[in-house]
């Protein structure tokens, strides 16, 4: 059992900034952003500076406002349900495991024409402070976060009831809609108009001891948003690490395991649990005999250059794009240790 004092709702921004916290993708203060109900998870109110991560709830039949960020990039990961996003001039379907990337200056919108609610986890880099004004969490007159309002909002936040988390839709490999898939576009095309990604498709990487894919990163065409996806097999522990300049929001998307978080240490974790690890905060994960395996994935901004410097993907400030590939079941389970 995790001490409640380690959870993000009970820690100040300063405590999280220096030592991290345990969160969950369905637990955070609720605001309205672009007409949609939104849970704020990692943001300046939790000590994050380079990125904000929210969960956006899109009810059946609902459509967002159309909006543009001239400064920030945004990526949406579909965790459950199905939506359509306005991407590269057309409505594109987003299903569990798919990510939609929007560069700065690109208009976008979301609609749900299905019969059920959808849950999207979105990363905004850098954070858009104006999204927090109407909820009283950011004071535009003085240009600062309202710490007392944030404290009360976090303490009184009602976790979103989505039923058993292990019964949410599975995030799987998809390569439909090829015209907008990142692997079929050049990095320059992705950087200009955005693209559709998938969590199981990207550049192969094993630098922290796990089979994983670099999904959103500069070699694929993104600049500020970053996302990696990994399998943590039974009996496996990754290399404990920090990121010098990247805040990370590390999610256990499915399965069971343990997370290591800053000054908290090892804590049990399950589907939807998150290690909030701002830059410099030690973090990692492992699967034990009675807790594992799991699928892990982290949003980080800027993309973690420290991971790729030792590889052939980076040299003297320039990224080399390898051929994207699928992270397969056989590759995942080949790493199991017990």
In which residue ranges do the predicted regions lie?
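Short, charged/polar surface micro-motifs in flexible loops or helix N-caps
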Residues: 46-49, 59-62, 82, 222-223, ...
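Residue-level recognition of conserved beta-strand positions in structured domain cores
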Residues: 55, 68, 80, 87-89, ...
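Conserved hydrophobic/aromatic beta-strand scaffold that supports enzyme active sites
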Residues: 38-40, 53-57, 75, 91, ...
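Ligand-binding loop in jelly-roll beta-barrel domains
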Residues: 49, 84, 96-98, 104-131, ...
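Non-catalytic C-terminal interaction regions
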Residues: 4, 268, 274-279, 285, ...
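A short, N-terminal "cap"/entry segment at the start of jelly-roll beta-barrel domains
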Residues: 1-50, 135-224, 239, 311-338
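Conserved short histidine dyad/triad with adjacent acidic residue
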Residues: 35-42, 54-70, 209-214, 228-243, ...
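A short beta-strand-loop-beta hairpin characteristic of the jelly-roll/cupin
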Residues: 62-96, 106, 237, 243-271, ...
């Amino acid at each position: 059992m995790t001490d409640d004092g380690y959870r993000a709702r009970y820690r100040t921004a300063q405590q999280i900034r220096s030592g991290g916290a345990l969160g969950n993708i369905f637990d955070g203060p609720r605001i309205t952003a672009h007409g949609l109900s939104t849970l704020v998870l990692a943001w300046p109110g939790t000590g994050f500076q380079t990125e904000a991560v929210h969960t956006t709830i899109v009810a059946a039949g609902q459509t967002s406002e159309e909006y543009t960020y001239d400064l920030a990039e945004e990526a949406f990961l579909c965790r459950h349900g199905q939506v359509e996003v306005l991407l590269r001039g057309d409505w594109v379907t987003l299903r569990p495991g798919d990510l939609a990337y929007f560069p700065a200056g690109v208009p976008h919108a979301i609609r749900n024409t299905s019969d059920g609610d959808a849950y999207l986890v979105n990363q905004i880099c850098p954070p858009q402070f104006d999204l927090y004004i109407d909820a009283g969490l950011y004071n535009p007159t003085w240009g600062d976060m309202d710490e007392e309002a944030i404290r009360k909002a976090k303490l009184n936040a009602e976790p979103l009831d989505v039923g058993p988390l292990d019964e949410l839709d599975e995030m799987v490999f998809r390569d439909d809609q090829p015209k907008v898939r990142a692997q079929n576009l050049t990095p320059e095309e992705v950087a200009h108009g955005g693209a559709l990604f998938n969590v199981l498709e990207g550049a192969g990487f094993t630098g922290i001891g796990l089979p994983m894919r670099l999904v959103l990163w500069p070699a694929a065409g993104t600049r500020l948003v970053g996302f990696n996806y990994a399998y943590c097999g039974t009996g496996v522990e990754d290399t404990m690490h920090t990121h010098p300049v990247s805040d990370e929001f590390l999610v256990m998307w499915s399965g069971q395991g343990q997370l290591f978080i800053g000054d908290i240490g090892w804590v049990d974790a399950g589907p939807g649990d998150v290690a909030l690890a701002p830059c410099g905060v030690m973090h990692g994960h492992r699967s034990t005999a009675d807790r594992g395996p799991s699928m892990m994935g982290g949003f980080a901004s800027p993309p973690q250059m420290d991971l790729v410097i030792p590889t052939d993907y980076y040299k003297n400030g320039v990224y080399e794009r390898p051929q994207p590939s699928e992270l397969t079941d056989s590759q995942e389970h080949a790493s199991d240790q017990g």
